[in-house]
Amino acid sequence: QGAEGGGHTGSVPTSVLLPQVVDAVKVPVVAAGGFFDGRGLLAALAYGAQGIAMGTRFLMSTDNKVPRATLERYVNAKDVEKIQVSYLVDGMPQRMIPNEYLAMLEKASPLTRLRLALRLAQRYKAQTGMTSAHALKVFWQGLREDAGSVAQTVMAANAPMLLQRSMIEGNPAEGVMAAGQVAALINRLASCQEIIDGIITQARERRAALMAISAAGGSHV
């Protein structure tokens, strides 16, 4: 998966990463990061991949059970540059649709962010049934292994709780919305069947157009 995807796999774009992987391994390769239509599928096949994986495209589907208020935030995200990677949620890199909560985190002091993380950790502990003894054990284990990981341990509950707010409770302003950059290029929700059929049709059309150019002598492809 290239950097265009969820942002947790590094900064190398798919167009650079994919040919490296295809040349390096002897197993089927499925490309991910930045794919949402037939043109991307055809490009991935041309690079040598056997197919593509899509997260954001299928998330933005009418078959999805995500509340409509949250899906509307995805559809309305039109600026690719604003769908940025952030470390503020749980200390790990992830790409997200901008919203009020992220804007607040960016302006908050480290102490405020820690207080918010502790509050979410308490909710996570209550929902998962984790005992206080188990929570303390995890905390002290992190402290022994790496004092710097304590903050990471405290923040670990942020992502699932904030995703719950937006993806389950339907409150996109107070949660987080993970996304690939292609969210800015998807103008409407569609069923999974429509998405797949549209990708196949477009890929075939683009392949036919390339073949026509080659047959007409307009290219050395």
Segments from the language model and where they lie:
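Active-site loop signature of alpha/beta-hydrolase-fold enzymes
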Residues: 5
